Swiss-Prot record:
Family: Belongs to the LysR transcriptional regulatory family.
Organism annotation: Klebsiella pneumoniae
UniProt protein name: Probable HTH-type transcriptional regulator LtrA
Keyword entries, A-Z: DNA-binding, Transcription, Transcription regulation
Cystines in this chain: none
Length: 309
């Protein structure tokens, strides 16, 4: 085997996964023609066509499918070898990629990173803020945080803290428009919801075993918690917010919780889980981040006012 083709095989796997020469070129900082030449070298060496290209998509030949599967196994073996070497290190060092939901990354994880860097000066972190399913191997993820009650089978992990939601407004808004005392009172208010589906405007509450649902209305909706928080601060209405987003503004008195005696039930609630793909040969940097987040994230809930249960 020509070992000089190993980089081409790695690039070939990326091409198949991405389905685009140009996407792979951008990802690797090379030109599409360089990607095309890489495939041509492989096809010359293998003596067969690996990819069928059309104007819209790439299709693997039978030989290409076989090569792709073996190349994937080769890359996974290489990753395991590197992780195995890293697990023998006693000092946490190297680059770690951490994938987190956008709002959690902005309000929970990013504020903790400066202290992490101080504690572990030889660890570099790539914090990826993304709200999508992921594949630890294909996406190059070391650790991930996800809000779920049922982590995917095959993953290892631990819950760090519950994610609860509250509804909030400013004192100025409530003085002008009145304070709601029951969920049904919200019908007379401008409510700021997530806005991704019609169900996001149907707010559900629970108190002493009783559940109430109210159809809310408002001139503004936004699918990012920071935007909804800012809208609430600007007196635009009563907004639904994760408690981790609202906590600082509540503590400062910038906003107040509305209907605090009712539990606001959100379909986006659950536990914040720290997840990883395997326990074998774990690099010291991964263990350091797991230990650090296990220590610091649960502490964020200490002393905070949770919604009524």
């Amino acid at each position: 085997m020509n070992l000089n083709l190993l980089p081409d095989l790695a690039l070939f796997v990326q091409i198949v996964d991405q389905g685009s020469f140009s996407a792979v070129a951008r990802q690797n900082g090379i030109t599409p023609s360089a990607v095309s030449r890489s495939v041509s070298r492989l096809e010359r060496e293998m003596g067969c066509k690996l990819l069928q290209r059309t104007t819209r998509k790439l299709r693997l030949s039978d030989a290409g499918e076989t090569i792709y599967q073996h190349a994937q196994q080769m890359l996974e073996a290489a990753r395991q070898a590197m992780d195995s070497a890293g697990s023998r290190q006693t000092v946490a060092q190297g680059k770690l990629t951490l994938s987190v939901p956008k709002a959690v990354g902005r309000f929970v994880i990013h504020p903790l990173m400066m202290a992490f860097f101080h504690r572990y000066p030889q660890v570099d972190v790539c914090l990826r803020l993304e709200d999508r399913p992921l594949d630890f191997i294909d996406d190059g993820i070391d650790l991930a945080l996800r809000i779920t009650d049922t982590p995917s089978p095959g993953l290892h992990g631990k819950p760090l803290m519950p994610i609860r939601h509250v509804i909030c407004a400013t004192e100025a808004y409530l003085q002008q428009h009145g304070t709601p005392y029951t969920p049904q009172d919200l019908r007379a208010h401008s409510c700021i919801s997530l806005g991704e589906t019609p169900a996001d405007a149907r707010w559900k509450f629970r108190r002493e075993g009783k559940t109430e649902t109210v159809q809310t209305y408002g001139r503004y909706a936004a699918n990012h918690t920071a935007v909804r928080l800012d809208a609430v601060r600007q007196h635009l209405g009563i907004g639904s917010l994760p408690l981790f987003t609202a906590r600082e503004a509540l503590a400062n008195g910038d906003i107040v919780q509305v209907l605090p005696e009712w539990e606001f039930i959100s379909s986006y609630s659950g536990d914040l889980w720290l997840l990883w793909a395997g326990d074998k040969h774990m690099p010291a940097r991964m263990r350091a981040m797991i230990d650090y987040l296990s220590e610091t994230v649960p502490a964020l809930n200490a002393g905070s006012t949770e919604p009524a249960k």
